[in-house]
């Protein structure tokens, strides 16, 4: 019988308890956007559904205000 290869080590949550999801917190938002500028999925981010919803709204708001690019054209 093969045991699963999961490690017993707990992962750190991607968003710490003190961090607030806000459109002005660009360093936080950049961690959840791919190199192409796409918002990463909830499974890749390891966020709760509420956190993912708030993150999506904040990223879209930052894009409209030109704080984050819609596309990353650095080739």
Swiss-Prot record:
Cellular compartment(s): Plastid, Chloroplast
GO molecular function: rRNA binding; structural constituent of ribosome
Pfam families (alphabetical): Ribosomal_S18
Keywords, alphabetical: Chloroplast, Plastid, Ribonucleoprotein, Ribosomal protein, RNA-binding, rRNA-binding
GO biological process annotation, one example: translation
Keyword Nucleus among record annotations: no
InterPro entries the record matches: Ribosomal_bS18, Ribosomal_bS18_CS, Ribosomal_bS18_sf
Main location: plastid
SUPFAM superfamilies: Ribosomal protein S18
Entry keyword annotation includes Thylakoid: no
Recorded GO CC terms: chloroplast; ribonucleoprotein complex; ribosome
Oligomer status and interactors: Part of the 30S ribosomal subunit.
Family assignment from sequence similarity: Belongs to the bacterial ribosomal protein bS18 family.
HAMAP family registered for this protein in UniProt: Ribosomal_bS18
Protein name: Small ribosomal subunit protein bS18c
Species of the source: Marchantia polymorpha (Common liverwort)
Biological classification of the source: Eukaryota, Viridiplantae, Streptophyta, Embryophyta, Marchantiophyta
